[in-house]
Amino acid sequence: MYQKFRAYGFLKNLRFFDPFLVLFFREMGLSFLQIGALFSIREICINLLEIPTGVVADAYGRRKAMLASFSSYLLSFALFYLFPRFSIYVLAMVLFAFGETFRSGTHKAMIFEHLRIKGIEHLKVEYYGHTRAASQLGSALAALIAAGLVFYTGSYRIVFLASIVPYILELFLMASYPKELDGELVTVEGSWRRKLVGRIVTTGGEFLKMFRRPQLLRGLFNGSSFDAVFKSTKDYLQPILQSQALALPVLLSFGADQRVAVVVGVLYFLIYLATSYGASNASRMQEKARSLPSAVNLTYLFGVALLFVAGLSTWKGVHALSIAAFFGFYFLQNVRRPMIVGYLSDLIPQRTMATGLSVESQLRTLLMAVIAPVIGLLADWGGVGMALVFVALGAAFIFPFLRVRGGKTEPDEIL
């Protein structure tokens, strides 16, 4: 299963649109506020569906949830490619949200279920870190392929058509996963409606208990807040790279979009190679810290500092420094993510792992739904740099309330 987990991570991140998403929307004539609104719509839909789909994954089977996820993604990609209109993009974002909610937390829970069955739960950071490393390798390769596609076609639309192929392969991969990774299912007698309600009540009642433990609550908000800031701001690297690419005295015989494609593709390739290394070595970096909670706290603060530098340097027109800060921000996120997942997995019951991780993801999407349009509005009004600075200051302000503390709480204590 180790190789299948890595294959999942690799194929999942062959999202050829990722390095060019904001540039694609700008090419279609959207403002930063409209782009932020699309991101917000996506996150609101994810927020509404996150916990119910996590419960369904725990109650009806994680494999079926993953199959539904990738089917929704495929429909979304097709709409983005075929119908370049804002109203259609809204529908495509809703379908994308369905894909995210069925997948969110579910595959992590399948990894942890495999580790539990094999009796190697102590390897959770290594397993998840290596899976994430494969994901970043997929992203690195996707950046180069996407750059080639954009360079050849002269348009960003092609990246959505190309993204369909790896996600079809993901459908076959998910179908090959063993049934044992579905986890413990709750059996309720009666009609299918009674079964659905009974399972939601049974499983849902357990995630409500998570909110009664301050230690777990801080961990959930710590992880979700940092990820919300990262995901809300990371794509603003693209217009910064665009400005830098057009300012460089290279490839002048090619068109503007072609020059941007080369610079964006190469730099995203390097970013994802670095983040792949960071994810695969998360456990080593964790060992250098005094404890897992200390590592979680330090990476939060360092990440916020990098975002502030990126925003301030963009504001002042020092794009090279901004790109370097974003490079560090991407790297840190992929070092940090396995740590926070490992921290939370020590506090969440195994049988509701998918639900518990989906709770964290729901908190993240709720925050993103608020942050994304605000960033877009600020970017339209005062520029991308100012928007990033304001977000970094806000993230720093709330840290004292999110600081996690040492001491391990066994999952059984939560029940």
Roles of regions detected by a PLM:
Residues 156, 163-192, 403-415:
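Helix-loop junctions on the cytosolic side of multi-pass membrane transporters
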Residues 71-85, 89, 301-316:
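C-terminal ends and interior cores of transmembrane alpha-helices
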Residues 4-23, 35-57, 61-73, 88, ...:
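Substrate-agnostic recognition of the 12-TM MFS/MFS-like secondary transporter fold
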Residues 150-165, 247-263, 374-396:
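A membrane-interface helix-boundary motif in multi-pass transporters
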Residues 31-39, 124, 128, 156, ...:
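Juxtamembrane helix-start elements in MFS-like secondary transporters
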Residues 179-221, 251-252:
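Juxtamembrane intracellular "pre-TM" segments in multi-pass secondary transporters
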Residues 31, 61-62, 85, 154-155, ...:
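A helix-boundary/kink motif common to multi-pass secondary transporters
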Residues 19-34, 235-261:
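Short amphipathic helix-loop junctions that connect adjacent transmembrane helices
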